[in-house]
């Protein structure tokens, strides 16, 4: 499959640079040290975010025009980090997240999650407004 390279690239991008950059961002571990790009292993947070935005700009899915497991994995990162505020709210990221969440399987999964949470609430859920 000619898309295999892109598929593998984005699976590993999500697991490596994206996750590391977002966790460091969440923990406030940003460095102004000029050596940061080589020490951190992914460049800068801005480079990671810009790389992802460039890849998603103008495409429906990360491997082009068809949905793949790479979208499930990368999309879960995008959706989670948008919700947490660690990934900046940019139109490209929001459009991608919205496309993924509008898929029939995502809608069904969310309904199942909601039903399970109602049947098995966890302590403190009421205080969270859920």
Regions found by a protein language model. Give the residues of each.
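A short, structured active-site edge motif that brings together acidic residues
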Residues: 1-3
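GST-like fold's C-terminal all-alpha helical module
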Residues: 10-102
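Short coil/turn segments at secondary-structure boundaries
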Residues: 23-25, 110-113
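Short, flexible coil/linker elements and helix-boundary hinge sites characteristic
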Residues: 28, 41, 111, 120-121
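Acidic/histidine-enriched, glycine/proline-rich intrinsically disordered or flexible terminal extensions
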Residues: 113-130
């Amino acid at each position: 499959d000619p898309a295999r390279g892109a598929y593998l690239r984005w699976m590993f991008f999500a697991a490596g640079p994206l996750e590391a950059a977002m966790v460091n961002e969440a923990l406030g571990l940003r460095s102004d040290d000029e050596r940061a790009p080589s020490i951190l292993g992914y460049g800068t947070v801005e480079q990671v975010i810009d790389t992802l935005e460039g890849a998603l700009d103008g495409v429906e899915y990360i491997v082009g025009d068809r949905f793949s497991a790479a979208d499930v994995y990368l999309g879960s990162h995008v959706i989670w980090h948008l919700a947490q505020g660690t990934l900046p709210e940019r139109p490209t990221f929001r459009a991608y997240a919205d496309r993924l969440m509008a898929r029939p399987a995502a809608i069904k999964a969310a309904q199942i999650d909601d039903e399970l949470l109602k049947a098995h609430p966890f302590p403190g859920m009421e205080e969270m407004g859920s």
